[in-house]
Structures are given as C-alpha cells and as structure tokens.
Amino acid sequence: MATMMGCSTASSTKMTHTEWCKTRYEAAEELYKAKKYGRTVEKLEEILSTCAGSGYMEQAQFLLAESQFNLEHWIEARGEYGSFIVNFPGSPFAETAEFRKAVSSFNMDYRIDRDESNTTTAMKDFERYLANHPNTPLRDSVNYYYNLLVDRVAEKEFQTGRLYLRMEKPQAAVIYFKEYLETYPKAKHRQEALFLISDAYTDLDQFDPARQYLAIAQNEADKDEKILKRINKANDKIASAEESYEKRLKKESEKKRLQKEEKKLAE
C-alpha cells in the first residue's frame, strides 16, 4: 500500500512554470548545438511567448538572435539583436549583440543600382557600437567592415558619374566625379575617375580643367607606361576638341558678322 501511495504521489507532482521553461530552453539549446537553427528558432519563439518571469528570457532572446544570424536571416537577426539590446542592456552579451547587429546590417541585401539605405543603416550601427564601446577589442573588425561600407558608397558615386557621362550629361557627371575624388581620395576607381572627369570637361568645352585633371593623373601614374600612353592620347583628344571648338566659334562669329551686314544693307 505504501509503495502504491508513493507512486501515486510522484505521478501527481506537477512541473513548475520555471521547470517547464528550463526544459524547453535546454531542448532548444541542444538543437542549437546540433546546428538545427530552424527548429531552434521555433522552440525559442515559444519560450519568449510563454516564459516571462522565468529567468530564461535573456538566454532565449540572445540564442534566438544567434540562430537567425547562423541562418543568414539578416533582417530578422538584426531585429532580434536590437530587441535583446533594448530589453537587456546590462547583459554580458549586450556588446556582442550590438556588434552582430551591425554585421547583420552589413549583410542585408545590397545592390549598386538600388538605394543605399541598408548601407547607411549599417554605417550608423557600427558608429553607434564604437561610441558605446570605445575600448572594444573588435575595433579592427569594425574598421574592416566600415571601410567596405565606405567603398560601397564611393562605388555608387562613381557609377552614377559614369551613367551621366553615357547619357551625355557631362555637367552632372562632373559634379559626381568631383564629389567622388574629394570625398574618397583613396578609392579604387580614383585613376579612372580622373580620366572620366577630364572627358566630361572636354565635352563641356572646358579645356583647362580637363588638362588639370589629366595632370593629376600623370603625377599619380608613377611611370606606368600604359597610363602615360592613355594620358597622351587624352591630351591629343583635348587638343583636337579645342581646335574644333575654336573653328566653330570662328564660324559662328563670321556668320553673325554676315548677318549684321545683310541687315544693314536691307535698311
């Protein structure tokens, strides 16, 4: 009888809410360790919706963000890291969460022919991270990502300038190339931009600035024969364009003179 009563008592013992949450969290953790991130996400979302006050919310929120990160669901990962930072700012995982939030932003969909809002968002995330953690050991990694983001913005400026040049809008091209050269002096397309802005000024019949930018290209060529050959060719193009421009001016001037004389004779 005693044995039967003991079994009855044990079987009727109810699991507490905290114990239930602990069991669920440990199961999610095992799935995460097994790299079953999709199933991990499902378990953790259940915990977050049912385990408030259990003591497992912080771990669950962070592990959910990590799972989305490993799934390369960048928008979701950024959102979960952001929620973690807001809800648990004093957590020992907060700095890691803020860094990975920025990395998630960096990895969000990017195409050169689209707007650069994702790039701007990522830059702000890294800037905020450094402002909040100035002594971080991850500074080199932050600088690496940030420089790549700067390259993206520079590339957009450069490609926009090229587009305007192809559209035969040299004045707009000059604006973008000047901005590119002044803002990103070490950008990878700097040399090409010097040639293209020279072409744009030539198209505008502004030959002095066209030659000035070629002179900069020559100073930076460092005896590169291929570049020097291209510079000589560009100078010849400017000279030819200038000669045609002067002939055109002379012709127009002569036309105006004749029109003026004809008008006098008609009076």
Predicted regions mapped to residue ranges:
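Bacterial N-terminal signal peptides
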Residues: 1-4
